[in-house]
Design a protein with these regions (language model features):
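Bacterial N-terminal signal peptides that target proteins for export
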Residues: 1-13
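Bacterial N-terminal signal peptides
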Residues: 11-21
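N-terminal pre-domain segments of enzymes
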Residues: 25-58, 423-453, 457, 686-689
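Acidic, proline/glycine-rich low-complexity intrinsically disordered segments
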Residues: 30, 36-41, 48-49, 71, ...
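Repeat-blade elements of multi-bladed beta-propeller folds
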Residues: 41-45, 83-106, 132-160, 221-250, ...
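Asp/Glu-centered strand-loop micro-motifs enriched in Gly/Pro and often flanked by an aromatic residue
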Residues: 54-98, 480-488
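Extracytoplasmic/lumenal domain signature
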Residues: 63-76, 107-131, 161-219, 251, ...
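Charge-patterned, long linear interaction tracts outside catalytic cores
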Residues: 259, 488-491
Length: 689
């Protein structure tokens, strides 16, 4: 049956059995969804707490290597060209898997036992969809119920919210407001752009007539989505995303306000202003009326929630333009912050800004992780945000009080004309940073004296310094070529943090990633005819050169390990262990400059993809096509299983028809983005045929 715009392909109907016989008892706390049957994976992070934990114990260290691939779902044909990216984690609800795929971000329902496609939905084409960014970075879907009926909630790159019947893929009746565009259904959709801009001064003053096909004119701004909504206590909470700040050249954009809708009706409920308006808390952190014209501050990363307490946790990114903020003086709340919002009202309960006046692309890239732990003999409900700076900021998730002291420490000032940085930044005292925060001679490559000399000589051409190193422009009086941002924005962005809620241990995937960058006048990089260029006013400075810091003879300039997994006991803030992620890449082992040397395990050049179960930490190193079983308490590798391609982004699991499954997203330059499901053979699982 051919697929048409705005339609669904129904391949197989009927209810699919879900079973949880193998799932061990799990303590029910405010961090978890008390209504979720054991063995389900209802959120992209497994639970509302985003732990990526499956409380199942069938797969153990003893039988892990008996895992076999039972099906592969390929994403080859879900866009205008083959897509080698699949940045979405499936959810498992009521016996069915749901995910998004391809550059069209098609919604897909999959039989969890066989990998068959059950139905698909693709939104009709619009101009605003074509202007979307990160269209294939949807990360997944959300689920809920309306009068006992399972519903899948989907946010599109064009910024529409859809409510789909989980069984059939049809849009829910009497939900939302009809969109007056060809191919859209009569019901089951909300156009969220009008709710976003209806009280926004630049829109009201523009005189534009709203066009649902075009969306917001690009001289005002543009936004999309790159994570699913989260459904909490009958409320659908929606974040958004803008063009990457390092591509922006103009100072205006739409603020990424957080929106909420009634899950049963699609009715608009509330909006939280991420850039405070006059009279709102934080408005005074925007000087020179910069709040009027500045945008972004969205939540492109997934959100998490504490349903029992009615709180949703929102990680935000910086305001418009990375690496220069002279046009937006002040600390710029609620940029690069953690927000705790009342899900009923949208009111701020507490917040913490992890970077003041962020210009370093240090947006908070991970969903906050919620745990209940015992700290100094007292049971504490906590929330942890792992950041690009290499920190794990930890708070009481009810009050926002830091679990351990966070110190405001002096940082370097900028000598860039027009820039005024914050004189201090917040540094957690515990846990210690999980990534290096300055590139010095002490952490340069030292496999041989010659390689080290080359690295030391290379570093002389760059402006280096501790964390929050100020950017410099091309032609800086120092003669330095660029400034080094260390860590860079890639340190922990692609491998979600996971946790074991039973033990309170957090597992962080981190990659050593420093970058060399410099600035030029905005006119040098502006592309006025690019449909993704937004705003009207050229920035005084924009980033010109974003590149890896090249080491000697093509080797990394820094010492290994190149990537690691770090286990942190969140009751003490101390490391349990840290291990290289995977094994030394072939290009390092076989490098001519290292011939004859005994090179220790450097780890992969990439992020670990992880999930936890009652028995194991399961990881894919991101470089080699393998899956590892790891001892949660020691980090020791316990088993290995081959995959058809390296694992990427998110891993998930579920118990279906009495058997525990692990699903890994795999992809490579020669292997289209796919889902691979593994389970034990019946005999190994101790099951009768």
């Amino acid at each position: 049956m051919p697929h048409t715009f705005g339609s669904r392909v129904l391949v197989l109907g009927g209810a699919l059995a879900a079973a949880g016989a193998l799932v061990g008892a799990q303590s029910r706390t405010g961090t978890l969804d008390p209504a979720a049957p054991p063995g389900e994976w209802r959120y992209i992070g497994g639970d509302a707490a985003h732990t990526r934990y499956l409380p199942a114990d069938e797969i153990t260290a003893d039988n892990f290597e008996k895992l076999e691939i039972v099906w592969t779902w390929r994403g080859d044909n879900f866009g205008p060209q083959v897509d080698y990216v699949l940045r979405a984690t499936a959810i498992y609800v009521d016996g069915v898997l749901y995910t998004v795929a391809g550059q069209r971000r098609t919604v897909v329902a999959i039989d969890p036992g066989t990998g068959e496609t059950l139905w698909t939905y693709r939104e009709p084409p619009t101009v605003r969809f074509d202007r979307g960014m990160r269209n294939n970075y949807g990360k997944g879907l959300a689920s809920g119920e309306i009068a006992g009926r399972k519903v899948i909630y989907y946010t599109s790159p064009a910024f529409f919210l859809h409510a789909l019947d989980a069984r059939s893929g049809e849009h829910v009746e009497n939900w939302g407001i009809k969109v007056p565009l060809p191919g859209f259904p009569r019901s089951g959709v909300v156009d969220m752009l009008p709710d976003l801009v209806k009280d926004w001064a630049p829109w009201l003053e523009s005189g534009y007539k709203y066009d649902p096909n075009q969306g917001i004119p690009r001289d005002l701004g543009n936004l999309s989505t790159s994570s699913p909504p989260i459904v909490v206590n009958g409320v659908v909470v929606v974040g958004n995303v803008h063009e990457q700040g390092y591509y922006q050249t103009r100072t205006e954009n739409i603020p990424g306000d957080i929106l909420a809708y009634d899950a049963r009706t699609g009715k608009y409920l509330w909006k939280f202003h991420v850039i405070p308006r006059p009279g709102e808390f934080g408005h005074d952190t925007w000087k020179n009326d910069a709040w009027i014209r500045t945008g972004d501050v969205s939540s492109w990363a997934p959100m998490s929630a504490d349903p029992a307490r009615g709180l949703v946790y929102v990680p935000t990114n910086p305001p418009t333009i990375d690496f220069f903020g002279g046009f937006r003086p002040g600390a710029n709340l609620f940029g690069t912050s953690i927000l705790a919002l009342d899900v009923r009202t949208g009111k701020r309960v507490w917040h913490f800004q992890t970077v003041h006046h962020d210009i370093w692309n240090f947006d908070n890239p991970q969903a906050p992780v919620l745990l209940d732990v015992t700290v100094n003999g007292q049971r504490r409900p906590i929330v942890v945000e792992t950041t690009k700076q290499g920190f794990a900021y930890t708070f009481d998730r009810i009050t926002g009080a830091p679990i351990w002291p966070i110190e405001e420490r002096p940082v370097a000032a900028s000598d860039l004309p027009g820039e005024a940085l914050s004189p201090t930044q917040p540094f957690p005292t515990r846990p210690k940073a999980f990534e290096i925060q300055e590139l010095t001679e002490d952490n340069l490559i030292d496999f041989t004296p010659e390689l080290r000399r080359e690295a030391v000589e290379t570093l002389k051409h760059y402006k280096v310094g501790p964390l929050f190193n100020p950017p410099i422009q091309v032609g800086h009086p120092s003669g330095k070529r660029s400034f080094v941002s260390c860590p860079s924005g890639a340190s922990n962005i692609f491998g979600p943090t996971v946790a074991d809620p039973e033990t309170g241990v957090l597992y962080v995937a981190t990659e050593r990633a420093c970058r060399a960058e410099n600035l030029v006048p905005g006119s040098k990089m502006d592309e006025p005819d690019d449909p993704k260029t937004t705003g009207r006013t050229l920035s005084q400075w924009v980033v010109a050169n974003r590149g890896d810091l090249r080491g000697p003879q093509g080797l990394p300039i820094w010492k290994p390990p190149y990537s690691r997994i770090v286990a942190i006991d969140m009751s003490t803030g101390e490391y349990l262990w840290e291990q290289p992620n995977g094994d030394t890449p072939a290009r390092i082992k076989n490098h001519p400059a290292l011939k004859g040397l005994d090179i220790p395990n450097t780890g992969q050049m990439g992020h670990a993809v992880m999930m936890t179960t009652k028995t194991l930490l399961i990881t894919a190193p991101g470089g080699d096509p393998v899956l590892y079983a790891v001892d949660k308490r020691t980090g020791r590798r316990l088993g290995t299983v081959k995959l058809p391609a390296p694992g990427q982004y998110g891993m998930m699991g579920y118990v279906h028809q009495g058997q525990q499954h692990v699903v890994v997203q795999v992809m490579s330059p020669t292997h289209p983005g796919s889902l691979v499901a593994l389970r034990l053979p019946r005999a190994a699982a101790g099951k009768k045929p």
